[in-house]
Amino acid sequence: MKKSVVAKIIAGSTLVIGSSAFAADDATSQAKAAFDSLTAQATEMSGYAWALVVLVVGATVGIKLFKKFVSRAS
């Protein structure tokens, strides 16, 4: 009687451990997919940021040159 109870407990714990390991694999793959998506979004946003940096620097240089030419013309 005692051996069958111990065998059932061992079988049940093996089933629980096996299913939790499977769930952990799924969670790991979901986390990896989330970080891959985040990396792709960050790369895309940095591309937009560089275009904005070029625009701001170009506008700043243009304004300074305009001020320089206006002050010399007057």
Curated annotation (Swiss-Prot):
UniProt signal peptide: 1-23
Taxonomy, superkingdom: Viruses
Keyword Chloroplast: no
Transmembrane stretches, start-end: 46-66
Membrane side Periplasmic: residue ranges: 24-45
Quaternary structure annotation from Swiss-Prot or TrEMBL: Homomultimerizes. There are several thousands of this protein in the phage capsid.
Protein's name in the database: Capsid protein G8P
Naturally occurring in which organism (per UniProt): Escherichia phage If1
